[in-house]
Amino acid sequence: MALSREELEVIERGLGRPPSEVELALFRSHWSEHCSYKSTRMWLRRLPSRAPWVVRGPGTDAPLVEIAEGLFVTFKIESHNHPSAVDPYNGAATGVGGIIRDILTVGARPVALLVNLHFGPLDHPHARWIASNVVRGISDYGNRVGVPVVGGETWFDEDFTYTPIVLATCVGVVEKGKVPPGGVETGDLIVVAGLGADKSGLGGSAFASKTLREESEEDLGAVQVADPLMGKKLIDLVQEAVGCVKFIKDLGGGGLATALAELAEWFGLGVEAELDKIHMSDREMGPAEVLSSETQERLVFVVSPQGLECLKSLLEKYEVPYSVVGRFVKSGRVRLLWRGEVVGDVPVWLAAKAPEMVWPRESYEPPPLPEIPEPPIDKAVELVLSSPNVAVKEAIYRRFDFDVGVRTAVKPGEGDAAVLKLYERGNLGIVVKGDANPRYAYLDPRLGAANAFVKAYRNVAVAGGVPKAAVDSINVGSPARPAVYWQFVEAVEGLKEAAEALGVPIVGGKVSLYNEYGDRPIKPTVAVVVLGVIDDVSTALRALWRDGDGVYLWGFTRGEVGGSEYMYRVHRLVAGRPPSVDYAAEKRIVEEVQRWRGRLTGAKDVGVGGLAAALAKMAVASGVGADVDVCKAPTDMGRLDYLLFSESNGRFVAAGEEGPGVKIGVAGGDRLVLRCGSTQLFSRSVDGLKELMSLGL
């Protein structure tokens, strides 16, 4: 992507001369929207990121959250939307590889991956091609590097037919003493390790900073190529290298241009790099290409001269190619050489920060919810339960090796969130879940973002975790569209409100702009991943009940069907406002589940598809039916369709001999029966539900 005229003027003023070709390459990469956040960082600074347990927040490759004395968890989210649109297999695989390397920068061992995937309808050939290859790319890479894919969220909507949203989150664990210490000083060396530089991924950050069009398949060269074997070597290398090195940085988006500029800025020093010294797979590359190359499976290590031999011995042990390409100096400049000649010399202050861009904003009102007739309930239940957005996602998660590493205590499909055992501290575990709802975010971006936050928070709580931290990913169209930029700003405000009200800091995130195809932007997609702590993973709750259990509903059901799956599937409408948020009620769910945790068989939150979907999912997961009187649910309305399909927040279903909230039924038999008093509304065998709710991919 070309620099704007205004940006070129800033560069020329800062340098006092026109930039060289190599300097232009540096600015094109590092000042791209993908790397610089020039249109968004002024808003992202508003997000709360501090708490006593947050050791390191946003601003570096990976945060650190202390979950037990001396034990840190790190987690980070990344988008790979544009690459996955044109080469879904490599786009998704390299997205997973990149987020794993972010986690490695703090010396952590990656223990889990989550994916938030948004595709077009599966009956569309192109959308199906993207979906199947994205899933294959994630599966192949995660399985081969030995990091389990333990959960996530999948959504289907026409907006994502040509512009998928592919988000990967990696979770890692590290002891306090194994985090690289920092303390970088002049004379320290810069070592690049991993695959040799080549032209794959060249211009990838610029590619991710423009809209997709029909000719975007010509951008295949901007998509990096994954190499999970080298990725696995880097994982193993880092576990031993932390004793040799001062700092680790992922060599990803923006290539060496971004890595050098960020390292110099972070440590308040200058850097001098000999670009011709880097090991290359393609010897035809010139200095500008080497600087901008986004070849995958590479890390930058900062090491003292005394520590170099220690690092080199490990690199040779793991057969990882490497180059000593530069050093830190006092100059406060990024100085680039090629075969002994200076080809770039830029002040760090100029290279580090692209000028901020604040775009015009224009709000809009969502379509109002019209008066609609109440449909036949049994047909409505069938339509909602057969929706791909409600369906059981076994067709996706069965392709992932979610048991590798033997930490996964609650597996995909078993509960509202993934639960992982941390062998470093007995039965201590972490609970993690990601959520997004593009319909909500389109209708009301602020409320939609808050809904994503509370849904992920509630999923963690209902599984038995105490939420501790969150990361987010905001995915929208071009910021040059006033309505789109308004969507982004409103989403930030919704996240800020939720994080402050719930007391959960946002320790990292990702913004992806220009998610459009032709002239059509996607529905804004605001994903939130919440991580919590559970003191004993053996008491984690799955979305199950046993024969004879009472079925209980905690929370109040309102007539909140705006943006719901019911309105879309049954009435073909995307209208109204998303459900309201009661933060106090969400926090009470944490307390309630903690109080009942040891006495319940299982629990499940009520979300997309409403109470009907929650009950059906528990029946399918358990292999046991239930007889439920939905009219016993606390509510202030009389419409049965709204009672069954409302997506009101602050609710969960629990099962056990006793339970929280109101008893609405009893589990047992091989059929799920929904009724109102003595009137049967819906009845289906558990096997029939499995067939109805299966996702065909």
UniProtKB/Swiss-Prot annotation:
Task: Report residues binding Mg(2+) 1.
Answer: E78
Q: Which residues participate in Mg(2+) 2 binding? A: D102, D250
An example of a Gene Ontology BP annotation on this entry? 'de novo' IMP biosynthetic process
GO molecular function terms listed in the Swiss-Prot or TrEMBL record: ATP binding; magnesium ion binding; phosphoribosylformylglycinamidine synthase activity
Q: Which Pfam families match?
A: AIRS, AIRS_C, FGAR-AT_linker
Residues at which substrate binds: S79, H80, N81, H82, R101, Q224, E294, T295, Q296, S512
What GO CC annotations are associated with the protein? Answer: cytoplasm
Active-site residue list: H34, H80
Q: What is this protein called?
A: Phosphoribosylformylglycinamidine synthase subunit PurL
Does this UniProt record's set of keywords contain Cytoplasm? yes
Judging by the UniProt lineage, the source's domain of life is Archaea
InterPro entries, per this entry? Answer: PRibForGlyAmidine_synth_PurL (IPR010074), PurL_linker (IPR041609), PurM-like_C_dom (IPR010918), PurM-like_C_sf (IPR036676), PurM-like_N (IPR016188), PurM-like_N_sf (IPR036921)
What is the scientific name of the source organism? Pyrobaculum arsenaticum (strain DSM 13514 / JCM 11321 / PZ6)
Question: Which pathway?
Answer: Purine metabolism; IMP biosynthesis via de novo pathway; 5-amino-1-(5-phospho-D-ribosyl)imidazole from N(2)-formyl-N(1)-(5-phospho-D-ribosyl)glycinamide: step 1/2
Q: Which PANTHER family match?
A: PHOSPHORIBOSYLFORMYLGLYCINAMIDINE SYNTHASE SUBUNIT PURL
Instruction: From the UniProt record, report the name of the gene that encodes this protein.
Output: purL
Q: Where does ATP bind?
A: Y37, K76, D472, G509
